[in-house]
């Protein structure tokens, strides 16, 4: 039996029961509130946008495209360390610091202008090929679409505008506005507050296990985009939806929530 909001529920043999009692008509509004999402919140970097576009500048500036995923992982470490130690670091600052560290580790001199140029490319990443059509399909449903990213607000807006995706979202929310980066609970709660819905009606879509874990811990529902190299953690509850790309995930969201 799964639990949500202190209640137990189960589906078996075509019947839904709550705390062992059959779900009658009076429970249907409550069940819709806790089981059906009305707001779909999308992570941006790697979930919607393809960071492989940075491989060429990494090759040019640092001599190896293989340093790009190392840089992104190190950037996350720096950002999360800041949050855990009470010394908040925004995503752009973490990106710049991680790039300097990767360059030093590789023994490659990198100027401030080089750092500016590469970090600036984060604002013009292309979407993964299936993303525009998947978002268009979701936009034709009753669902409300928002973006929730750790990127600072100006970068987030620039990213989605450059990728041609901004028009699909009623709001673009930066975790930076809460003073806490995902996977802390505050950014996920900010989505519910902004949209005026219970947090259980928010479904996060992300390609990162840590983002899925944060959303579920905050009380959201979740959908995992299992892009190449991305896997879920064996720890904690799994998300209700998993698919190899956003097209597959969107199809399941439309079936369950749309």
Tell where the protein language model's regions lie, with residue ranges:
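Asp-based, Mg2+/Mn2+-dependent phosphohydrolase catalytic module
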Residues: 12, 16-17, 27-37, 132, ...
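Alpha-helical elements of Rossmann-like donor-binding domains used by nucleotide-donor carbohydrate transfer enzymes
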Residues: 56-57, 97-101, 117, 133, ...
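Active-site neighborhood of HAD-like aspartate-dependent phosphohydrolases
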Residues: 31-76
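An amphipathic alpha-helix signature
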Residues: 55, 68, 72, 92-100, ...
């Amino acid at each position: 039996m799964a639990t949500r909001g202190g209640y137990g529920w189960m589906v078996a043999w075509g019947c839904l029961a709550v705390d062992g009692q059959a779900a009658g008509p009076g429970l249907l509004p409550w069940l819709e509130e806790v089981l059906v999402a009305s707001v779909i919140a999308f992570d941006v970097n790697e979930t919607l946008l393809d960071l492989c576009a940075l491989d060429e500048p990494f090759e040019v500036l640092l001599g190896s495209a293989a340093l790009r995923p190392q840089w992104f992982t190190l950037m996350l470490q720096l950002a999360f360390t800041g949050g855990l130690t009470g010394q908040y670091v925004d995503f752009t600052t973490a990106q710049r610091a991680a790039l300097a560290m990767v360059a030093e580790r590789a023994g490659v001199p990198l100027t401030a202008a080089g750092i500016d140029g590469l970090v600036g490319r984060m604002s013009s990443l292309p979407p993964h090929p299936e993303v525009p059509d998947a978002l268009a399909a979701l936009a034709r449903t009753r669902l409300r679409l928002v973006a929730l990213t750790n990127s600072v607000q100006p970068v987030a807006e620039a990213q989605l505008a450059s990728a041609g995706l901004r028009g699909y979202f009623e709001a673009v929310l930066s975790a930076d506005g809460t003073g806490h980066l995902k996977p802390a609970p505050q950014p996920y709660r900010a989505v519910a507050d902004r949209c005026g819905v219970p947090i259980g009606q928010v479904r996060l879509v992300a390609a990162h296990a840590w983002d899925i874990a944060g959303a579920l811990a905050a009380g959201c529902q979740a959908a995992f985009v299992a892009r190449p190299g991305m896997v879920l953690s064996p720890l904690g509850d799994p998300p209700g939806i998993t698919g190899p790309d956003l097209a597959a995930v969107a199809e399941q969201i439309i079936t369950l929530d749309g």
